[in-house]
């Protein structure tokens, strides 16, 4: 039996050729954590969790690696904020204004009048409450499909998720095997389901 050796690294790291060659030679592949590319709930300014614009920019530092050894991270969670607008600096830590939100937790908001506003530069959307005092930054089926198309076209080894249960629908009468809102989009696109 063959055992794989992998690692997960922040997209924010920078490598020179010597270090990249040493790392790539030590592992079968590298999972790049290409999410949490925002201030989340630890910083001071809310923005997109998984902006393609930011991902492309940060991946410039990874060009010293063979793309066929790199998997990019996809997120089925985001961040919820209240009392701030995207890009507005908070008076204190963002944890006082928001929280982590899973895709399953986010979905009921759409049935309660929340609206989507697509950001063409980031290639992902914000969602706003009816009174616009709350918003969520999160991927949706369209942005996930665009990301996996881009990953595949770009010659990367693949993708991975953070995290599996955040969009899971438990088995039921109409869904005997269970399903995933976002993960299944990627699985179908790659011809695995």
Predicted regions and their residues:
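Glycan-binding loop/region signatures in secreted carbohydrate-active enzymes
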Residues: 69-150, 170, 175-193
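Substrate-binding surface in catalytic domains of secreted glycosidases
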Residues: 1-109
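Conserved functional loop/turn residues at catalytic and ligand-binding sites
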Residues: 155
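Short, acidic/polar
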Residues: 11-23, 138-152
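Short secondary-structure boundary/hinge segments and terminal tails
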Residues: 16, 169-170
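N-terminal binding-site loop/beta-alpha segment at the start of enzyme catalytic domains
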Residues: 165
